[in-house]
């Protein structure tokens, strides 16, 4: 059975998108030199940020994979659950939101920001136990 976790919308993510929108608006209002082009770039970055903030999902599939889909514009990442070495919650600081650091494979690291942090880590452990029971 598939289980999907949605991305946690953080204050830092919202602040970044608002800042990009304000800079884009300022660049469009000034209209001197290359500022309209800079405003357009900020607008595109803001749109990509909104997509990533709202459409990121973390899906545990029935065949033992964790699929991290970082929005409609971003690339998806597939990690086999039995390759996950560690998953630990990291408290956010001033500029970073709370997130989960996932260590997998041979020294590879990625992050996740699901809404239910403890349930996400429990789901990883449950799927790993389920995979080990299948092997035995």
Question: PLM features: residue spans?
Answer:
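Ser/Thr- (and often Asn-) enriched beta-sheet segments in non-cytosolic proteins
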Residues: 4-6, 57-61, 67, 76-78
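N-terminal membrane-targeting/pre-transmembrane regions
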Residues: 1-31
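A general structural signal marking secondary-structure boundaries and capping sites
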Residues: 91, 128-131
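Transmembrane-cytosolic junction motif
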Residues: 47-64, 70
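Non-transmembrane, membrane-adjacent beta-strand/coil modules in membrane-associated proteins
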Residues: 54, 68-120, 135
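Single-pass alpha-helical transmembrane signal-anchor segments
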Residues: 23, 40-52
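Short, aromatic-rich membrane-interface segments at the entry and exit
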Residues: 32-40
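Charged phosphate-binding loop/patch that engages nucleotide di/tri-phosphates or the phosphate backbone
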Residues: 124, 131-136
